[in-house]
């Protein structure tokens, strides 16, 4: 298959590749199509026999144990942790599933989480443009891609995936990093809760079952099976079926839903080892309830239990305007990304020299000015104020946070609705009504029945002044690759092709300049 050279970025006849690496699966395919041509697990099998190393990327071979095989992750918490294997997996998918002969002349769009580090983004550009020799590339935020897939350029994306749950406001297709929130209560955590409930039972994967009726007989293998292979098989088979079959979310908190639970019937699931697992309604509803009210004591040792839900990002949404000093040259091309690119007015230039603490920091913001001369006056005026008014004001501040939402304790982990509330309050007040009217629910774990109605109920109770509307894809399977679908739509737009970053531009200005000027 020959690939036409990428000569004009404004043309419409450009076949781009879209890569969407997630925590559970990695989706790869052509732009302009409605589903990815390659869906592979975000893990690989490393088989070492007699000094030789073989790597397996397809899911079905990974479910069959081999001597000396260990399964290792490529993506964790939506971030690529093994770049060498990621490149090898992408090349395998392009050659095997997409029948791609050469990357030259073809652009590629890569989705990434909003909290992706600067080092990881530099590595992305290096792999795509240098190692894999794509003609051009673009890095798109997952939440921005989801907004394009739903046709909502301004929305609030609630992504409940395998490792991470994320809430991100998207304004005109751009994700606001400083208003994004996340926690680590998602599908993987539900797997842990299910396994904890089933103890002391041993969860036996299908490949270890020789016979399950009338009596269970475990298969004996001639080699030792690595623990990672057993965990991978259970995660892809038993836990997935369990969550899709038995889990349900109550329309309101379980404490106020007890009477309705008493009328619910029990449900059962046949385990791979032949046992019929029977669960009452209270147990089935309690698993997914932790998406809303996580219990910190249930977290396994070493689990990243963030209590604030704040996303730490290396970049800033705030971009200072570039102004020119009076009497200086208007050509600021050579001074971009320097202190001179945002000069102060001539009247205050001497003041800036006298006050070195007023220099902009790395985020482009200036520190708060410390005025010692005016502090005495302010102190005197504060003493004159009525003491009763001060006491009332201080008590009000102690009980009600500034955003108007009931504060959680220091040791309480934020649930999904807490993340939405925090993200909404961090956004501009003029945008909140639009965001509330376009709440997009996506991610593999969002397929649990009752999730959308419960989020709507909790939001109407916590923020009654706003009118909320939940949006989600009617195809449940599509929610697992909705980020890829948005990237496919984005890369196929004729007006988007001017945003491609070519290899020549990368070699000319370098990755640091590109990340600051083109991929903020």
Swiss-Prot record:
Kindly list the biological process annotations in GO that this record carries: chromatin organization; DNA repair
Q: Highest taxon of the source?
A: Eukaryota
Q: Where is this region: Disordered?
A: 320-406
**Predominant location category:** nucleus
Sequence ranges of Basic and acidic residues compositional bias: 362-374
Polar residues composition-biased segments: 339-361, 389-405
What does the entry list under GO cellular component?
A: nucleus
Q: State its location(s).
A: Nucleus
Keywords attached to this entry:
Activator, Chromatin regulator, DNA damage, DNA repair, Nucleus, Transcription, Transcription regulation
Signal sequence annotation = none
Question: What family does the Swiss-Prot or TrEMBL record give for this protein?
Answer: Belongs to the actin family. ARP4 subfamily.
Q: What does this protein do?
A: Chromatin interaction component of the NuA4 histone acetyltransferase complex which is involved in transcriptional activation of selected genes principally by acetylation of nucleosomal histone H4 and H2A. The NuA4 complex is also involved in DNA repair. Is required for NuA4 complex integrity. Component of the SWR1 complex which mediates the ATP-dependent exchange of histone H2A for the H2A variant HZT1 leading to transcriptional regulation of selected genes by chromatin remodeling. Component of the INO80 complex which remodels chromatin by shifting nucleosomes and is involved in DNA repair.
Q: Which PANTHER family match?
A: ACTIN
Quaternary assembly: Component of the NuA4 histone acetyltransferase complex, of the INO80 chromatin remodeling complex, and of the SWR1 chromatin remodeling complex.
This chain's protein is named Actin-related protein 4
Q: Which organism is it from?
A: Kluyveromyces lactis (strain ATCC 8585 / CBS 2359 / DSM 70799 / NBRC 1267 / NRRL Y-1140 / WM37)
Give the lineage. Eukaryota, Fungi, Dikarya, Ascomycota, Saccharomycotina
- Write the gene name: ARP4
């Amino acid at each position: 298959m020959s690939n036409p050279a990428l000569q004009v970025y404004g043309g419409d006849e450009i076949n781009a590749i879209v890569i969407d690496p997630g925590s559970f699966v990695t989706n790869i395919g052509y732009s302009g199509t409605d589903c990815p041509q390659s869906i592979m697990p975000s893990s690989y099998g490393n088989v070492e026999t007699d000094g030789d190393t073989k790597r397996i990327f397809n899911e079905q071979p990974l479910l069959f144990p081999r001597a000396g095989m260990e399964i290792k992750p490529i993506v964790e918490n939506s971030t690529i942790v093994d770049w060498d294997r990621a490149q090898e997996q992408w090349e395998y998918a392009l050659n095997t599933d997409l029948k791609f002969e050469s990357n030259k002349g073809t652009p590629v769009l890569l989705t990434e989480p909003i909290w992706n580090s600067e080092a990881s983004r530099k590595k992305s550009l290096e792999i795509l443009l240098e190692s894999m020799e794509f003609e051009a590339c673009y890095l798109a935020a997952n939440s921005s891609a989801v907004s394009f897939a739903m046709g909502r350029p301004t929305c609030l994306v609630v992504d409940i995936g395998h490792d991470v749950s994320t809430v991100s406001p998207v304004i005109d297709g751009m994700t606001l990093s400083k208003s994004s929130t996340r926690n680590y209560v998602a599908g993987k955590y539900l797997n842990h809760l299910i396994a904890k409930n089933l103890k002391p039972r041993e969860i036996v994967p299908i490949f270890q079952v020789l016979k399950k009726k009338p009596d269970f007989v475990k298969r004996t293998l001639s080699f030792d099976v690595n623990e990672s292979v057993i965990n991978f098989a259970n995660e892809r088979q038993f836990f997935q079926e369990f969550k899709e079959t038995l889990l349900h979310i109550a329309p309101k908190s379980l404490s106020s839903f007890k009477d309705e639970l008493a009328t619910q019937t029990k449900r059962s699931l046949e385990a791979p080892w032949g046992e019929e697992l029977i669960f009452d309604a209270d147990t089935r509803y309690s698993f997914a309830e932790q998406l809303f009210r996580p219990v910190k004591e249930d977290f396994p040792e070493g689990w990243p239990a963030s209590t604030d839900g704040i996303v730490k990002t290396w970049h800033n949404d705030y971009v200072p305007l570039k102004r020119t000093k009076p009497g200086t040259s208007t050509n600021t091309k050579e001074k971009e990304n320097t202190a001179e690119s945002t000069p102060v007015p001539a009247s205050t230039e001497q003041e800036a020299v006298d006050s070195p603490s007023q220099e902009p920091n790395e985020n482009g913001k200036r520190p708060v000015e410390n005025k010692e001369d005016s502090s005495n006056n302010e102190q005197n005026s504060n003493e004159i104020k009525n003491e009763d008014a001060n006491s009332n004001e201080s008590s009000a501040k102690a009980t009600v946070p500034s955003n108007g939402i009931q504060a959680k304790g220091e040791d309480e982990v934020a649930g999904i609705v807490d993340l939405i509330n925090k993200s909404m309050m961090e956004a501009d007040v003029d945008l909140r009504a639009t965001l509330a009217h376009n709440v997009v629910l996506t991610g593999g774990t969002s397929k649990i029945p009752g999730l959308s109605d419960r989020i709507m109920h909790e939001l109407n109770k916590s923020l009654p002044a706003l009118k909320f509307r939940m949006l989600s894809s009617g195809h449940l399977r599509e929610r697992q690759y909705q980020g890829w679908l948005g990237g496919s739509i984005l890369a196929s737009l004729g007006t988007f092709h001017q945003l491609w970053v070519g290899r020549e531009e990368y070699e000319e200005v370098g990755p640091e300049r590109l990340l600051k000027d083109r991929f903020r």
